[in-house]
Amino acid sequence: MTELVLRSDKDGVATLTLNRPDALNALSPALFVELRAHVESIAGDVENVGCVVLRGAGRSFCAGNDLKSIQEGQEAPSPTYQADTVDMIEALPQPVIAEVRGHCYTGGLELALCCDLLMAS
């Protein structure tokens, strides 16, 4: 099974990559579960992680919420799971940089705007 959010750490920088390039990194409930797990891990690791970069794999940052997963009946663990995860990113003690390239719609824009710095191309 493909990881929906990849994490790589180098020189104190944790890079989180939304990893659904074939779907333009659309946000499914499963992706948010993985994203939150990484965010929780990073929040507790201020000794080793000094900065976070949030990016999308492929040609798009994020095309927004995955409407197909909603139509298929996939549900988040709670009604506020996505919003709570965005709030957790905003509250991280480390600065978070959104590396935005390509599409950045709806939920993807929420992700970008919760970061401390947004770099777009």
What are the language-model segments listed below?
Residues 19, 65, 101:
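Histidine-centered beta-alpha loop that forms part of the nucleotide-sugar donor binding/catalytic region
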Residues 16, 54, 66, 111-113:
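Hydrophobic/aromatic residues within transmembrane alpha-helices
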Residues 88-121:
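Glycine-rich beta-to-alpha active-site loop
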Residues 1-57:
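Conserved CoA-thioester-binding segment of acyl-CoA-metabolizing enzymes
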Residues 26-29, 63, 72, 114:
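Phosphate-coordinating loops and pocket residues in cytosolic domains that bind phosphorylated ligands
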Residues 48, 56-88, 104:
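Glycine- (often His-adjacent) and acidic-residue-rich active-site loop
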Residues 31-35, 81, 111:
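Hydrophobic alpha-helical membrane-association signature
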